[in-house]
Each structure stands twice: as C-alpha cells, then as structure tokens.
C-alpha cells in the first residue's frame, strides 16, 4: 500500500465523501483511465480539451479503489453514486492537479533518507539524468525519472516510483511556463540540483533568455544551508550562483576537485581526466562532455570515489533519440528527441570535426521559439551553409522559409513541408551513398526517427 486514505485526506486537505469497501488505501496512482489497474487511486485532471472527470466511471470499472473529484465540478453527485456502486472511496478536493502535486510531495517526504537530486536545463536533462543514474548505481539503489516525466504532472508521477529500498532519487524538472519551476522544486525539495545550461528553448513562452535563466534558477528556491547546486561556467554563472541558501559549484574543465582535461574523440565520445584517471564518455560531442562534467562534480560532492564514477560513466547508454550513433552502410547520428538553436549549433560543431568522405545533414524544425523562430532557423541555415556537408535536407515550415534567405553556393539543398515525409524519404534514399555520414536532428514534433529504417538500409 502506497498511502492510506487517511493520509491522502491529510495530504490534499480533502473531504472523504464515501469510503471504500474492504480497502484502507491504494497501491498506485493514475490519471489516465486507460492505464488504470486494480487498487489504483484515480486522479481526474482537467486539460485544455479533455476533462478527466469524464473517465471516472471507466477507472472504477477497471478496479480503481478510490478517486479524487473536484468539489467545484457541477456533477459531483454522479461520481459519489458511482463510487458507492463500485465500493470505492471518493475524496473531494479544491483542485485535482494541486492535489496530485501535494500528494506526491507528501509521499516523497515519507522517505527522509532518500538523497533527492533535481536536474533542469534548456537541453541535456535526460542525458545528465542517465549519466547520473549509471554513476550512482555503482554504489546506491537508484530510482530515476522514467522517460522524461518532468512536468507539473510528470514529476509527481515519477515520485510515486520511489520505494523504501531506494537510496538516491534522480529527477528531471522541466518547465514551459513562468512559475512552474518553483512549483516543481516545492514538490521535490532537492538536496542537490543541476542546471545543465540556459539556452533558447521556451524563449517563445518566456520571452527572453534572461527570463529563462530566472526560471531555471528557481530549482534552487527550496534550498537549505546544506543544499548544493551545480551550474555551468557560462554567461549566467554569476547570476545562477547568487542564492540565499546553500552553495553553488561551477562545473567545467579545471577547478578544484573537477576534471582537469577533456579530449574530444568525435563520434566515439570524449575522454575526461579526473583525479589521474581518464574517464571515457561514450556519447559524442563537446556538449555531452560538459554533461559528464556536471555529473562528475555532483558525484564528487556526494562522496563517490573516482573508480566508481569511472565505471558508471563508461557504461552510459544514449537515451532514445539523443546522440545515438549507428554504423551500418552509412554512419548516422540520430538526435531527434529535441532541438533548439544551441543544441543545433552543438550538433553542427560536432559534425564539423568528423572525418567522413561525404556528409549529409537532415534538419527538422525547432519548436517553442515564438517570435524568434524565423531568426533562429535562419542562423542554423547559415551554419549549415558554411559547413562541409555535401547536401542539406530541411523538414518543416520554418526551415522551408529560412533556406530561401541563405546563399548555399554549390551545396545541394532540399526543403520539405511536414506533409511531405514520403517525398523526403524518397529523395534521401536516392541520394545517399555507401560510406556517407548523416546527421538527423530535429524537435520531437517532427519525429525524424521515422527515417531510421531508411538509414539502416544496405547500400
């Protein structure tokens, strides 16, 4: 049993409208009626297009032993009747989303010995989480965010995976609106927190990069005097380091207790010198070397010895759609989970230092850039035009507009709208040659992983 109904009422300041027959608590939490299993607590959430209250009856039919309901909901009486019929508990709350968050926070506090680590940043959150999971698993029993459940709904969902045997919890904190990071920090209350970078992701929502930095900094808002934050050595270092409680470690090459040398080895990754040991980072790119520096700094603060840090780092696997290198008839780098101007520039920088007979770049639109989208896509096109790629393929309306504003010289350029995936596949298939190196980079919304079967084809 995760929590008793008495604990739920205390945590969410709810009123129990009716009791469950034969159950004192619940074993799991779900807000998706399709995923409900017996003995779940169902929490109906209101979205922009769908109201979870519509699915309360379905959740009860599938075996949910309790449901929360919004006490302001006009048909609350119907749900009480359903709960009575199915023998489930019904708890009325003022707001079901806030109740989910309060319940997750309450549940997390039941494990005071758990070392809580929070990770945020414009990019690199999931990669840093996976690096940290691998490193800390050398010594501790670790629980970590499944996938990228890092939002105001996803973080609470992640916290319910914590169990008594876990010693370290590593959680992503993402945001796409002002004020969300403080809410997430209040839910988790991290002992340690990493900011991977302050880029231009979400600039379309927050307006400026400075506003993004201010929002990311909120991950430190619940710090005590014993908490430790980690920030990169960049233009926002001083701003991010100025916090009222706790202390901040700046991670980068050099510095006391940190890596003293980094060697970029292209698609094979990089090597980092730490306490006399060369640690291999198996993910390509300088940006991933920086991600590794953050994790090394974190692990050193927690007290892991260098040999455990090395063993863990060297067994890191790339998360889905991130820095995934495949060597077949072609060599290709699949980095299609997320894209913003900074990660695009990092990918193109990586490719510039790769030795290949011929290079082909496939670039998909970057999302959530607002009024800066046109300029951002134009700048990426300028970088691509100056590269040594044989051909550049762009996919999406923003890049289709941007390519027309750039001088490409003798470089072949192909532009495809989102509804022209088949045409992109056919043209790419006809042009690729055995031995080519192909970069595939775009936002999640354009789903460029659909090109992978084509890229694996024997040539």
UniProtKB/Swiss-Prot annotation:
ATP binds at residues 121-127. GO terms for biological process: cell division; cell wall organization; peptidoglycan biosynthetic process; regulation of cell shape. Pathway: Cell wall biogenesis; peptidoglycan biosynthesis. It comes from Treponema pallidum (strain Nichols). It catalyses: D-alanyl-D-alanine + UDP-N-acetyl-alpha-D-muramoyl-L-alanyl-gamma-D-glutamyl-meso-2,6-diaminopimelate + ATP = UDP-N-acetyl-alpha-D-muramoyl-L-alanyl-gamma-D-glutamyl-meso-2,6-diaminopimeloyl-D-alanyl-D-alanine + ADP + phosphate + H(+). This is UDP-N-acetylmuramoyl-tripeptide--D-alanyl-D-alanine ligase. It is found in: Cytoplasm. InterPro entries: Mur-like_cat_sf (IPR036565), Mur_ligase_C (IPR004101), Mur_ligase_C_dom_sf (IPR036615), Mur_ligase_cen (IPR013221), Mur_ligase_N (IPR000713), MurCDEF_CellWall_CoF430Synth (IPR051046), MurE/MurF_N (IPR035911), UDP-N-AcMur_synth (IPR005863). GO terms for molecular function: ATP binding; UDP-N-acetylmuramoyl-tripeptide-D-alanyl-D-alanine ligase activity; UDP-N-acetylmuramoylalanyl-D-glutamyl-2,6-diaminopimelate-D-alanyl-D-alanine ligase activity. Involved in cell wall formation. Catalyzes the final step in the synthesis of UDP-N-acetylmuramoyl-pentapeptide, the precursor of murein. The lineage of its organism: Bacteria, Pseudomonadati, Spirochaetota, Spirochaetia, Spirochaetales. Its main location: cytoplasm. Pfam families: Mur_ligase, Mur_ligase_C, Mur_ligase_M. It is an enzyme of class 6 (ligase). GO terms for cellular component: cytoplasm. Gene3D superfamilies: Mur ligase, C-terminal domain, Mur-like, catalytic domain, MurE/MurF, N-terminal domain. The keyword Transcription regulation does not apply. Keywords: ATP-binding, Cell cycle, Cell division, Cell shape, Cell wall biogenesis/degradation, Cytoplasm, Ligase, Nucleotide-binding, Peptidoglycan synthesis. Its EC number is 6.3.2.10. SUPFAM superfamilies: MurD-like peptide ligases, catalytic domain (SSF53623), MurD-like peptide ligases, peptide-binding domain (SSF53244), MurE/MurF N-terminal domain (SSF63418). It comes from the Bacteria. Belongs to the MurCDEF family. MurF subfamily.
